[in-house]
């Protein structure tokens, strides 16, 4: 095979926040994503499983693009990386009806793909999941080295008596890489995920309780003076019956890092399976 005809396949897993890491890595290499999907995650609650869901496939490039759609059963391996699994009678990949499965999208254009769930067996209570892939196909006239994007969109469907239950064994913050670390067991029949908001202010601004009162745990709004930084916290899911350590990083711009005092307060409000966890971390940093 001639080296000039080698096709490089760049796979981008689009899981809530995980995708941005891979897209960022591609950008650092000078590779701008040509394919985008919205929304990046599909959820059908128990009262929606008979509904049809739609996703929009966008061609961000300057040439027409062909895209092929496929579906897999999946989970995470021990390192929290995507792992393809064989189908089972209860896996959602066996129940999804997708139309169309091959698209031709004009430059800077978009197309809609519809999905419906049609169970082939009586669904067990709880979560059923699949990963739907949108793979950019190599153009026949393409020459040289090509970068093709393969975007995965997780689809979750919930049936019957859904139990979101979890035990949070620990929640810590690593100041070196600005990352929250969670140790969580999902004891129900569906995944759980730590989701919430953070805010950074001066450490001597107020008491811990007063700092927490400024941060709205439902929408992330901040009362009073503008904080140094604020934003959303979310991580990969922990699937039913599993105990996992998951991470959620926050991104601080360089000018914000320089503006921080030698000691600052990081307030966080995190929801895990309906339980709210509130905490203020006092961070000492070297100047």
PLM features per residue range, with description:
Residues 52-56, 97-134:
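Ligand-binding face of N-terminal immunoglobulin V-set domains in extracellular IgSF glycoproteins
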């Amino acid at each position: 095979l001639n080296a000039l005809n080698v096709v490089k396949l760049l796979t981008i897993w689009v899981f809530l926040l995980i995708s941005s890491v891979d897209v960022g890595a591609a950008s650092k290499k000078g590779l701008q994503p040509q394919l985008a999907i919205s929304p990046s995650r599909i959820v059908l609650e128990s009262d929606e499983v008979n509904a049809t869901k739609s996703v929009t496939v966008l061609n961000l490039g300057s040439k027409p693009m062909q895209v092929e759609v496929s579906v897999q059963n999946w989970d995470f391996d021990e390192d929290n990386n995507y792992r393809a699994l064989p189908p089972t009678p209860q896996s959602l990949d066996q129940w999804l009806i997708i139309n169309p499965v091959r698209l031709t999208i004009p430059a800077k254009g978009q197309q809609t793909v519809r999905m419906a769930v049609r169970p082939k067996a009586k669904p067990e209570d709880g979560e059923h999941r699949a990963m739907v892939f949108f793979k950019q196909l190599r153009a026949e006239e393409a020459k040289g080295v090509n970068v093709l994007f393969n975007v995965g969109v997780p689809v979750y469907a919930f049936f019957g008596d859904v139990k979101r239950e979890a035990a949070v064994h620990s929640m810590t913050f690593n100041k070196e890489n600005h990352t929250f670390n969670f140790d969580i067991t999902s004891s129900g029949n569906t995944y759980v995920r730590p989701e919430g908001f953070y805010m950074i202010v001066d450490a001597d601004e107020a008491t811990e309780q007063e700092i927490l009162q400024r941060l709205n745990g439902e929408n992330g709004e901040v009362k009073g003076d503008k904080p140094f930084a604020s934003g959303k916290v979310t991580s990969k899911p922990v699937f039913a019956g599993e105990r996992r350590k998951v991470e959620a990083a926050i991104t601080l711009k360089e000018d914000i890092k320089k503006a921080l005092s030698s000691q600052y307060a990081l307030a966080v409000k995190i929801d895990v399976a309906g339980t709210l966890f509130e905490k203020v971390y006092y961070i000492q940093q070297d100047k």
